[in-house]
Amino acid sequence: MSSHREEKVRRIAAPDIAARKGGTPIVCLTAYTAPVAELLDEHCDLLLVGDSVGMVVHGLPNTVGVTLDMMILHGQAVMRGSRRAMVVVDMPFGSYEGAPETAYDNAARLMKETGAQAVKVESGPTVIDTIQYLVKRGIPVMGHVGLRPQAVLVDGGFKAKGKAGEERRRILEEARATADAGAFAVVVEGVAEGLAREITEAIEVPTIGIGASAGCDGQILVTDDMLGLFDWTPKFVRRYGDLRGEIGKAVAAYAEDVRARRFPGPAEIYFAKAG
């Protein structure tokens, strides 16, 4: 029997992220599959199994059609592929906006079946009590203010927020209320840079920016956007790769080799043993 024992790695948890307020910026990316989670794990503090999976992986027009079962399936995959990074799973549209008891049942199922360390909800006046309800019952919650993808049908599209006075005040108050309700961190998405800084200074938990400000306590991007897998890049994304181009080249080379009967070659096929 081998004497080798795999070294146990302690996974980052909500208190670790909360303690990073004002410190070294927190590195976050989205993950939906085990292989990608494995690649990101070494470099990230937090992996978000975002409901953006509906658009990125399943081709939906927005996140409204994402189901709890979909989030559980992808959450399980990301947990299998990662060892160190904290894994947070989005609660999809319709799973938490009603009675807090229903939200708890859905959140508890999500955490039990995935093994994730926390859930994320989009904040708002009707959700603050639910955040408090979940946290009091042992479920770590990450909030989300500003541009809220699940509210896209109400808001009329993916538009930057917080440029006008009343909207700016409302988003700031939602962030404060979310932190006061017990969220361990708050995603701040698609808001004016000055507002993102103001939120970061106003609340005692870390802010995770996406299209917000370098002054946030951490940053997150959709991994597929950052790697250049799509031909359209949102304004707030910096592309660190061109995987769309690289994949296109690789597939074109494969197709050419197949049509020319250069693949498979001697190195990729099996031969019967002599005798």
UniProtKB/Swiss-Prot annotation:
Give me any GO biological process, just one: pantothenate biosynthetic process
MF-aspect GO terms: 3-methyl-2-oxobutanoate hydroxymethyltransferase activity; magnesium ion binding
Q: Spell out the subcellular localization from the entry.
A: Cytoplasm
How does the cofactor attach, per the note?
Answer: Binds 1 Mg(2+) ion per subunit.
Assembly behavior = Homodecamer; pentamer of dimers.
The UniProt family comment states: Belongs to the PanB family.
What is the official name of this protein in its record? 3-methyl-2-oxobutanoate hydroxymethyltransferase
Upper classification of the source organism reads:
Bacteria, Pseudomonadati, Pseudomonadota, Alphaproteobacteria, Caulobacterales
